[in-house]
Each structure stands twice: as structure tokens, then as C-alpha cells.
Amino acid sequence: MSTILKWAGNKTAIMSELKKHLPAGPRLVEPFAGSCAVMMETDYPSYLVADINPDLINLYKKVAADCEAFISRARALFEDANREVTYYNIRQEFNYSTEITDFMKAVYFLYLNRHGYRGLCRYNKSGHFNIPYGNYKNPYFPEKEIRAFAEKAQRATFICASFDETLAMLKAGDVVYCDPPYDGTFSGYHTNGFTEDDQYHLASVLEHRSVLAGFCVDHAGA
């Protein structure tokens, strides 16, 4: 199953191999949600899905809460707004409007992801999404993926939190899948990046918490 979003480092293509390293357990915990490919390709009784990016978590919450309303509004936008000037107008509203609802911000986030350059997700130091227009002829509207996600999401809790906060919520028996951002990648880790110090801190936290949970850490840059 493909994911709702285009995403750098999406694990869909390697899930058949990755699943061999994920033990059984009552709950899968993901401190770095990304595209949610791991949630979509596994079958745990429940999930705790976290990310520090509020736009990402807002999207997942809105799709889970009202899949049909989300599809209706997003599909209309995809049908009518594949133009450069419209893309930048939507990006402007997404970044600066104080009146935009969380629902519309989720719709816009999907639109920007699918119409922006290479599906990248990047913010400037002010926290503004700054990916340029991708100039694609016919961006794919992931209706099938949205419906599948909404169904699986009924088993999940989505939180906007740092990896520290997420790992502090572990319970005995949890399975943790960690795919931290690569050092120095174009996509970054929200506004502040993910530094070498963050990598060491994550390793320390995982070691401290290992008595509670089983871990699978996937990081080509480690």
C-alpha cells in the first residue's frame, strides 16, 4: 500500500524485509512518523504515532476524524488548482493566515505535498513551508490511500511530540520503530534540523528505555 504523502525516506519499498525485524507486541510506537508507511504495512493491535511536525500530525488526525469530508474537499482542490500562481497563493495562506481552520490546513498540506517540488517537506527558520512549485502535469490524488489510512488510523493515537516525549510514554511490551532523520538532509527535521547531538541523545534514550520495549532502529546515516 502506498502512503498518503510523498516522503523522503519512505519505507514502503523495503517493508517486506523490514517486517522481519519487527517483533510482535501489543503496540507499535513510532517517534518519527514520516509517511506512516510502517503503520500501514504492519498489523499491530494499536499504534502510538508521533512526530514533531504539527502539520503532519494535524493531517493524520483530520483524515482519521472525517475521511469523507477530507476527500471531498481535497479532491476539489486537486481538480481545480494545479497552477503555479494558485500553488503560491495556497502556500501563502497556509503559512500566514490566522483564520485558516485546522481542517483546511490539513487539506492544504496534502495539496502542497503532492504539487510541490519532489514532494519535499521543508520549513525555514520562521517555521514557514518553503518548497517551490513542482510543475507536475497531473498530480496524483491519493483517494485509495486516504481511505486505507483512515481505516487503520482507528487503531492509532497521533501526537505532536518530540522523540523524548514519545519514548517517555512507553509501556512494557511496546515495540518501537525508530527512523530518525538523516544528518544534513534536504528535508530536514522541522525548523531546527536534526543534529549529531540529537542522534547521540536519541541513542542514549533508547538504551535507557530498552528494558521496557523491543526496538528496531533504521538509519542509514547512523
Predicted regions mapped to residue ranges:
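Short His-Asn-centered micro-motif
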Residues: P31-F32, A50, I159-A161, C178, ...
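A residue-level signal for conserved active-site and pocket-lining positions in enzyme catalytic cores
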Residues: L18, G34, Y60, L110, ...
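Conserved S-adenosyl-L-methionine
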Residues: N10, H21-E79
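Short active-site oxyanion
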Residues: A24-R27, P45-S46, A153-T157, E207-A213
